[in-house]
Amino acid sequence: MVGVLSMAAAAAPLPVKDYEIEPCKKRRKDDDNSSCETITKYLSPIGKTGDKVFSPPKPSNILHYFRKTSLTTEKPQSTKAYKIKPSPPLLVGNSKDCKTPLEVFSNREFKRKRKRVSLSSQLNDIKIQDECPVEISNNDSKEDGGLSDCVESSASVSLYKEHVEVLAESIEDSRNQPNTKSSKKKVNPKQCTTKSDDRILRKRKRSKVTGQSESVPLADELSLPEDGGKDSKLTKPSLAEENDSRTHATKRADLKESTITVSYEEFVKSHKAAKVEEIPDPAVPACVPSGPGEAVKSGSEGELSGSCEPSPQLHLKTVTVLAQVHPTPPKKKGKIPPIFLKQKQPELENSLSDPENEQPVQKRKSNVVIQEGQLELAVLEAWNSEASVPKCSMEERQQFMRAFRQPPPDTLKNGFKKPLEKQKDPSEKSVHEGDSSSEKIIENPNIQRVSSQGCLQSHADRGSFPKEKSKKPNKKGKKTRTTAGGNREENIQKEKTAFSLKDEQDQNSLRRSVRQKSEVLKSNALLNSENLVCEDTAHDSVQMSLCNRNKSRSSSTPTRDMVTHHRAEPGSSLEYVSTRQPIRRSLRSCSTPATNALGGTESEDAQDTIPVKASTPKSARTSEKHNLYTAELIIVSSDSESPIRMKFTRISTPKKSKKSSKKSETTEEELTSQKKKANSTSKNISKAKELIEEAKAFQIGGSKTEETVVPLRRSSRHQARSAKEKSPEIDDSVIVIDSSPTSIREPEKSQKKLQNLNDVLGKKLNKSSKNVPGKMKIAPLFLAKRTKRAAIPVFDLDESSQDSSEQTQDCDVQFKAKRDFLMSGLPDLLKRQIAKKAAALDVYNAVSTSFQRVVHVQQKDDEYWLWHLKPPSCPLLTEFKELNTKVTDLSEYVVAFGEFSTLNPNPRSNPAAVMMRTRKDFTKEVRNLLLEEIKCSNPEFSLEKYFPLLLKKRIEHQVLCEGHGKQASPQLQPDVSQKETKRKQVATGNQKSKRKRQNEYSVSPEEMKGRSKDLDERISSSCTNLDPSRDSGTEDMLWTEKYQPQNSNELIGNELAVKKLHSWLKDWKRRAELEERHNLKGKRDEKEEGILDLSDSTDFKGSSDDEENRLCNTVLITGPTGVGKTAAVYACAQELGFKIFEVNASSQRSGRQILSQLKEATQSHQVDKQGVNSQKPCFFNNYNIGKSPKKLNSPGKVVTSPRKLPPSSPKTSGQKRALLPKTLANYFKVSSKSKSNDDVGALMGDDKGVKNSSLEQRQLIQTKSTNANNSHIKDVGAEESNRKKATSLILFEEVDVIFDEDAGFLNAVKTFMATTKRPVILTTSDPTFSLVFDGCFEEINFSIPSLLNVASYLQVICLVENFRTDFKDFVTLLTANACDIRKSILYLQFWIRSGGGILEERPLSHCRENSRNTLVCSEDGSDANINSKKPKRNRVALPRCDTGCAEALFGLKNIASPSQDLLSLLKHKITTKEEWQKLIQVLTEFHVQNIDLLHSNLEVILPLPVHVVPDVRGAYGFPVTTQASAPASMGHLTRKQSKDQPLRKSQKRKQKKMVILDDSDLFDTGLDFSGELPSLSPAPSLSVEDNIRRDSNPEIKTQNSGFKPHSVPQPPKTLAEKKCCMLVSHCLNSLSEFMENMSFIDALLTDPGEQNELGRSAFHWTNGRVKSGLCDEFSLENRDRWAPQSAGELKATAEALSFTECSSTISKALESLNSCKQLERDPTNELTVCVSQRRHDACFRQSAANLDNADKRMAVIKSVFSSRSFLTLGNKQASIIDYLPTLRNICRTEKLKEQEKNKRRFLHYFEGIHLEIPEETITTLAADFP
């Protein structure tokens, strides 16, 4: 077709061997301008059809709109003005020896700088004036450089010879070899294309696609033969020539220009002779693909081969075109774009006037237009490469845009910005617009195959034709793809001017070509891309062209090349092909134009001659819709010449193109004759293909457009990158889009695609709207979504493989675009953080690739090596079972009886072990005997105070159960009135305070005796009446509430702390009463006098203020769990009349909720008026209790807590009764009106009513006087008068327990403390909480009560419940529970309600030897009363004792038989494996419970004789007697905590202080103390306690008298004595060995439980306290890998082995005891172990009853080792052993020195060495060891 103008201008020499043309012998230099001759003659066209066809002359140049004031100084004839340095030579053709030089136009034409010259007009001028032969070179890619050189030096255009015969043959061959053509096309572009060629090719492709889409039908017919010929003959030469052209690029540049003159008539005749076999112009083979697929492939090659070599037959006539350059016409007014004005013939004449006349006046524009009516003209443009294109001003640009009234295209989908688009060349625009045209050109390869003359004609035709096309796009601009608006308008103007003025267009084209030498390559590349894109779709071609444009802009090579467009025209079948010149803006930005050889890429040389084909976007789309056009780009690089021109040739006029043709009728009138000819030849084909297109458009319509919208653009970009990587030596690589090779029938497919594109652009506006300029700004991600919606399956698409890959790329790009869009508003810092996180995640993923991905369906992967590891080689580890990972299907199995259960016959046990749930009530005599037993076990416990209270509570509970039993049936009935009447009747009884009645028993011992007697009688008489089954009812009341203390006197232990709390609450009560009186007085005074008594008020206020300042409103109670903190608060509050609001850890207690619930209660003291509910506690709860579902079918006997009494349900409430406001939110909404008696009765719940009835019964039982009721009423009235109004008290339980939901809890507590007018009590079990919690509060410390008293208390409870228990069991239980009263009581309830323990026959145990005969009792009268019944004692049947409470707690009954005692199990000799396993299991259980069973009970389980040493002062020895009472002992415990209320040490305690431990006891557990350590009586160092005991006890004294040390020397030992000593030492050695082993185990195996205690155990030896939070990190992690169970098992095994060895050794040693006795020497006394009574009673763990001595020792240790001198010591146990004895000796010595008063001023030794130990500690060290 049309050869590249730059190549033609460069006049690259044709290879001599191929074309028989003499090579150029001299390379034109920049300064070699003398050779340029002015074209003085015109070669008149053969036919005058051009005159007929072309419309009246119009301004041919778009520069008319942008032209600035002409520069008179510029003279077109001056050659010096255009001197430029030679750009790097670029070979245009593939032929190795392109030696025919091109004669460049005369220099005077190119001296006009900054003037746009239309190429076609220049060609016309050249033709007419100078008839200088223009040679069209076949060089493809690298001829551009040569062209540029030639153009710089010469002003003559030489047309290449083209051989018609060869073309005909090549066409036939091309039919046979269409596929080879495409494959070669693929190869050639890579080898022989420069980057400029790439750009040109892309542009051409698009222009050709747009122009060709309509001409496809005709072009197909023509292209099939032509392509064949081209393929067969030119494919190989093109490849070889491309390689040669690369190698000989410089040689071609150096060759002199040789002109081959061909008679134009002969050329046209020969051309017409071979219509079907169109002359394969050097560009033709490259430009003409047999099918769209080939076209695409050949696009790149065709671009390169734009100047394909002419076939070797060079005898064809040469066409010599003489063109004269005309001066540019006068500047027109810029206001009205001349594109809309039809130019008249005079304008044409003016444009054709002699350029010399007008040169000095203004810029010259010359359009050389060669008009051939039926032949396609090859426009040969020459220009001076030196000229640079001036940029138009903003005004001109805006005017141009306004003229077209089309918004500038937004950034295209390929990402180009507006500024880039502004710089785009018209060629680029035309490329975009010419997507369809380029496709059409590809489809019409015949158009591309044009002889040199045909190319000139086609140029003329193109110059005239764009006008027609430009009109169409204007009308349908919205539907067409457009590049920059300015470029579009320029293209349109150029087209119109081309129609009007062929000559002018020729001149302009020549000037433009001069301007755009360097852009030849660019246009080639663009057109090549267009060709490639043509196959895919017009849209893709647009995108690719844009990419190429960007590349061409970015790389500006100052080469000016002459572009010669060759078109082989099959007779008149081919219509005008309008070639537009590239956009001037792009020319300015990048100076390397590229010529596109559209169609066949086989003959790359021919590609050079093919003009750049592009179309304006509108024209492109309209042409696609209605007509197929061949668009050729005429590039002009000269500043003084017109901008780029597009030449369009309309191939066919399908039906669809009627509208567009009508719109452009005015412009097409002159071309009608040629159109008719073209239509006549291609009418049938076009119709047939239209039908095919329409049929398949419905199927493939949407999919193609989708595919070509974005993906191909990106694919072209990626391919361009890959091409650059492959050919780094080339600046701009040709982007080759390879599609699957197509057969000869592929033109139909390409037509189908184009037709489909027409449908998309014309009919389916929603799809084509993506290309509308106004919508260019839409992000590609949104466009992609639309395309996905419109997706239709694609059928028979050549580029389907490309689309699939490009769609995936598009998805990635869309995702990135979406992410970038969403992150566009983020700050940089956040972006960096996100990027850093993403990078870290990538690194982590990369690192973790070796690990299996976690899948929640099946974690195990059988193929993974990790699941098939080899078994370990260790023989001990090879016996593991195989891991069975198979999941069994349970549905397949039928569960049968016995499969998961076994039926074992229960062995007949002792009938004594039968479980019984209920027991008969004890008789009076039995109860008294058991009370005597309890009294003897612990004489210090006051039975007279606790037993009556507990018994009354039990009777009350029984009556409650009876009341529930009576109301069981009415409860289930829906009748409310009946239940209400019953409640009222029950509630009418006198309401006496429980506390008052309970206190009646403590009025005096005499009253208590009488009442207990009466009570015993009553119970004994009613044993038959009271059904024992009533206890079997479901008991909903815990014993901790059932036996809850109602008075402060009922509490056990902590007497001082309770008194302090009671006094504090009493002060608050007094303060509240004073404030209440003040308020009442103020109101009365206001009512009566209206004026307050100032003096009284001020006095009262002052007193109240003083009291308020004195009183702290908050008390913090600390102490271990279960010692009675909360019970003490409730007891004191109930005694003093406080209403308690409890907030415990069981409810959600966030700060906001607490403040909202309690804000009313915190503002006043009084919270309730006088009434029944005044003393009921209120619990903080988030949930509405009244709305909770009621148990309708609850058991008959349900007993609830008297303290935590839930509100009655609506069903059980009366009509006038409202729900009790238990929730704090509703509490303050209670009406303040006083209730009548009926209302009070109605407000009482069932439980309350029953309780009152039970109280009434108890009153009747306890009081027999007739006026008892009146007295009780008086008492109640007095008590209620004291508590008219309940004072509020808020209680926060467990303030140290804070959950995640309790946000702001402590802050809310602090707010209450700061703002409330009521007392606040906080309880906590954390001793360090007071250090962490900030605030003003008083601290009250509760400690562990006396273990013996608690044990006696539990025995009394069991006695009240009709159970006889063993005191030793309770001591053991409390020892295991750390004396937790609540826990022990709850477990006791569970144990008793489960049936109790093992029943054993056991006589009464008494503390005296003579207790069997007479019961020694205390001074209580009750005991005297029992003594009076002494004669009946022998006749009373004592109940059997329930034992095994502690064993049941530890589950030992499951290990040993129920009847087997634990100590018997330990003493039993192990003979079987089962027994050994039992022993290990028992020891393990105790180790898990942190109990050292063997060490604690060693003296009992060893086979040594044991002697229990009773103390003279009591059954439990000295430590018990020192505590005259439980309160005294508790005083010792709380002395160091309650500093403000110190207790004096009892004198007895001071007198009896003894040193009973040596230093070895310092590192014991602290629970053991010296008197309880196992010690052999013959020990050399006897303790003081033992000496005292021997002195006091005559029996012990006589036994051990022989072993007392004597001052006199003893006689030598006899044989018997030696033997006895050996026996004793052997036993001692065994025992010491066992202790050594135990010590080693303790050191080796650390207790895992200690590490879980937040590390506090590490600080127990110092005074330091660990604040909460400092050791939290250790709480979640166990450093010791040994689990508690494993560590316990290991320790138990070692301990059992060691103990078994020790026991067996001692047993063997004792076998020789008889032999010693035979020698009249009995070592039994020496082997006997003396054990105190309390040590003997305790089991499992040594008693914690008296911890004073241990506490004193620990206090000394903490004080000493907390000083700075000892803080750095490591092992604390070793430090204690090393330092403490020495420090004690020093302190004693210093104490003696101080007493002797040797010096006037005594300086202690520790002060001299600056050892900072407190004076109190020094005094303690100097004293005897505690």
From Swiss-Prot:
InterPro entries noted in UniProt: AAA+_ATPase (IPR003593), ATPase_AAA_core (IPR003959), P-loop_NTPase (IPR027417)
Compartmental location: Nucleus
Keyword Ligase: no
Annotated ATP binding sites: 1119-1126
Sites bearing Phosphoserine, chain numbering: 44, 215, 351, 366, 591, 603, 727, 801, 1104
Region feature Interaction with WDR48, mapped onto this chain: 365-381
Broad class of where this protein is predominantly found: nucleus
Post-translational modification: ATR may stimulate the RAD9A dissociation.
Protein name, entry field: ATPase family AAA domain-containing protein 5
Organism: Mus musculus
